[in-house]
Amino acid sequence: MACAVLIVAAGRGTRAGGAVPKQYHRLGGESVLRRTLLRFAECAAIDVIQVVTHPDDAPLYEQAVAGLTKVLPQVAGGATRQQSVRAGLEALAAYGPERVLVQDGARPFTPPEVIARAIAALDGNTAAIPVLPVTDTIKHVDAAGHVTGTVDRAMLRAVQTPQAFRFAELLAAHRAAADARVADLTDDASVMEWAGHTVATFAGDSENVKLTSAEDLARAARMLADLPDVRTGTGFDVHAFGPGDHVMLGGVAIPFDRGLDGHSDADVGLHALTDAVLGALADGDIGAHFPPSDPQWKGATSDRFLAFAIERVRERGGIVAHLDLTLICEAPKVGPHRDAIRAEIARICDLPLGRVSVKATTTEKLGFTGRREGIAAMASATIRLPLEIGA
């Protein structure tokens, strides 16, 4: 096995406050720990993930790891971080990884680039840690709170996780420290330093913050709120031809020797777009909001349906990023009306024309559209919503 990850999540997180440990606080609908896990589960270079937890957190932990296939059975942590890491390493020994990354459970924003740099840093090194330059001035302060001097920060670095190690060497160092009753080492690089190994460094990232206090959690919530929740919905609709002298497509009346049968004006294009927008919102479908059993929608113009769906997006503080519509029929010919359809959809939705795409195709005379029995449409809608922050 090439690379394992050991995530330390056994702490109680008392400084963060709240009813649950900090690693189980929810950010954007997911726990901090799950967000941390996902960063590594999505990395192809990671084979397995071992999480060290507190026994009292079992129900919370099961929610955090639900559906994640790389995660091994949890291991109970010890009284200190050093003991917890040792327990996780002993459990991983059965899998024989060549490399191991040790990560804080409350560090949910680790960029993929940092993970890649951690793994690569072990090419030629036994231990490597992500660091950042110290930008604040550092002062020595005595017990009375008085400044006694200024530290030269040129050679100082702030240390993050994931810290990267050759697995066998890290396990041996932890065992040796335990045998020597050395129990005050605050990170795994310190354990390796104590054991006589050289620890290399690589670039960390300012976004790779550890959440320790209630203020950290609030800051993380604000950071997530600034990120858009991008969603895509799809829609599909079909209407058969019936008596008439025109068809409504995308809000445009196109002269034809037949019409389209439907409870409303049977605008197959606008119906598909409406369902696509509602689908992106997870807000039902056109039939749920405008049931054909309701006589008030008999003969209704379908621009009302699409405008309603667009307004639902805006009520939630979102925007429509793009609408894409494909009309499927042998006749009438859509090409001569394409620009008018795009313009009408843009008008209904109050969107720039560049955010609306309209295409047409045939089924090469196959199926009901090929037999000129009706028209089909499929659509997609991309929307951006503010990310909802969970409790």
Swiss-Prot record:
Which annotated residues bind 4-CDP-2-C-methyl-D-erythritol 2-phosphate? D237, V238, H239, H263, S264, D285, I286, G287, T361, T362, T363, E364, F368, R371
Q: What are the residue positions of the site described as Transition state stabilizer? A: R15, K22, H263, T362
Q: Which cofactor does it need?
A: a divalent metal cation
Report the pathway entry.
Isoprenoid biosynthesis; isopentenyl diphosphate biosynthesis via DXP pathway; isopentenyl diphosphate from 1-deoxy-D-xylulose 5-phosphate: step 2/6; Isoprenoid biosynthesis; isopentenyl diphosphate biosynthesis via DXP pathway; isopentenyl diphosphate from 1-deoxy-D-xylulose 5-phosphate: step 4/6
In this UniProt entry, which residues are annotated as the site Positions MEP for the nucleophilic attack?
R153, K210
What residue range is the signal peptide?
none
Keywords (A to Z) from UniProt: Isoprene biosynthesis, Lyase, Metal-binding, Multifunctional enzyme, Nucleotidyltransferase, Transferase
Residue positions binding a divalent metal cation: D237, H239, H271
State any GO BP term from the record: terpenoid biosynthetic process
Q: What InterPro entries does this protein map onto?
A: IspD, IspD/F, IspD/TarI, MECDP_synthase, MECDP_synthase_CS, MECDP_synthase_sf, Nucleotide-diphossugar_trans
**UniProt xrefs under Pfam families:** IspD, YgbB
Reaction(s) the record says it catalyses: 2-C-methyl-D-erythritol 4-phosphate + CTP + H(+) = 4-CDP-2-C-methyl-D-erythritol + diphosphate; 4-CDP-2-C-methyl-D-erythritol 2-phosphate = 2-C-methyl-D-erythritol 2,4-cyclic diphosphate + CMP
Residue ranges, annotated region (2-C-methyl-D-erythritol 2,4-cyclodiphosphate synthase): 231-391
Q: What is its EC number?
A: 2.7.7.60, 4.6.1.12
- Enumerate the GO terms in the molecular function aspect: 2-C-methyl-D-erythritol 2,4-cyclodiphosphate synthase activity; 2-C-methyl-D-erythritol 4-phosphate cytidylyltransferase activity; metal ion binding
The family database entries (Gene3D superfamilies) matched by this protein are listed as: 2-C-methyl-D-erythritol 2,4-cyclodiphosphate synthase (3.30.1330.50), Spore Coat Polysaccharide Biosynthesis Protein SpsA, Chain A (3.90.550.10)
Instruction: Name the segments for region: 2-C-methyl-D-erythritol 4-phosphate cytidylyltransferase.
Output: 1-230
**Which family does this protein fall into?**
In the N-terminal section; belongs to the IspD/TarI cytidylyltransferase family. IspD subfamily.
Q: What does this protein do?
A: Bifunctional enzyme that catalyzes the formation of 4-diphosphocytidyl-2-C-methyl-D-erythritol from CTP and 2-C-methyl-D-erythritol 4-phosphate (MEP) (IspD), and catalyzes the conversion of 4-diphosphocytidyl-2-C-methyl-D-erythritol 2-phosphate (CDP-ME2P) to 2-C-methyl-D-erythritol 2,4-cyclodiphosphate (ME-CPP) with a corresponding release of cytidine 5-monophosphate (CMP) (IspF).
For this protein, the record's PANTHER family field holds: 2-C-METHYL-D-ERYTHRITOL 2,4-CYCLODIPHOSPHATE SYNTHASE, CHLOROPLASTIC (PTHR43181:SF1)
| Full protein name | Bifunctional enzyme IspD/IspF
**Organism, per UniProt?**
Azorhizobium caulinodans (strain ATCC 43989 / DSM 5975 / JCM 20966 / LMG 6465 / NBRC 14845 / NCIMB 13405 / ORS 571)
Task: Point out the gene that encodes the protein.
Answer: ispDF
